[in-house]
Amino acid sequence: MKSSLKRVITALLAAVMLAAIPCVPAFGAQEYYVNDGENTLALADAYAIGADGSTAKLPERGVYAATASGTQLLGGSEYDDEQPNIPNGIVRVGLAFGSTALDAVHLQIKTGSGFAFGYYDSDRVFQSVGSTAESAVTVIADTNVTVGDSAFGAYHVQLGDTYASFDAAQAAANSCGGYPVYYNGSYRVRIGSYRSADDAPAGQGTVVSGGARCVLVVKAGTEQILFGFDCGSTRSLSLAPQNGSGAAITQVAECKERNGSRSCTYYGDFQFTRLSTQEPQKLTLVNFVGLEPYVKGVTPYEMSSGWPLEALKAQAVCARSYAACKIAPSASYDVVD
């Protein structure tokens, strides 16, 4: 009977140790069973037996080992069994930041069509402020910068009117060859892109330069500016790829160049933050994605599909647990790519 119990306790200890992983609530079966050779007994509680025959009940929140001197607590007597707080279920994945910040970011939707322009609020809820039907765009800082064969300037002509909606600003922009700008909660229209104020014609409006955090969305491979986002340091531009039939998948060209053969396609949305004036052309890039799509996307890169199914399941649990435990509301991102 004692040897049978020891074998059972070994299995129970493994289950208890799994239950002690922080941040991830674990729940075992309501009953454990042991066969003593004659009867099947239901054990409502788990016990460990030491070499001297002493026994100790194993609480749900403890990890114990049976030793020659009795049962010893290994750790994990307390853990937070509350569900981790993931605002709106969104994980922020840092793709480019610090020394890896980018001069420009090229996005190409692989599944879906068009982007919504907007920003994420403090609850990680996307607030839309405009859109485009283009499926390939480039995001740049509003400064003097060259991207491929296209040159952009920091100066523009701004019309005098303020518009209450994106549609109204877009209509005005279409009539004068300009583009709408979301400016601290309202809309303006700007025209052109000039390297200096002297180069900009002032006949249609006032010559202005964007703020220190202003960014532009450009039609990929052209000098056509689609949208400007100029809200200072309080908000960062986010682009939400659109796909009416399901989750959009987007390729980030710069990540593909950096990682070679890796496809660098992502679920979710993308946030762009312009760095300080020390490097005014640089942009950080953060992927905003739901926890489950994040796990679905990251697991194949960490473990190939040739692994046993149970191993893949375990890897998915690890990826989910790690992301859930790394949520950092006060930081710029939670995990890195």
What are these regions (language model features)?
Residues 2-337:
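Conserved, single-site charged/polar hotspot
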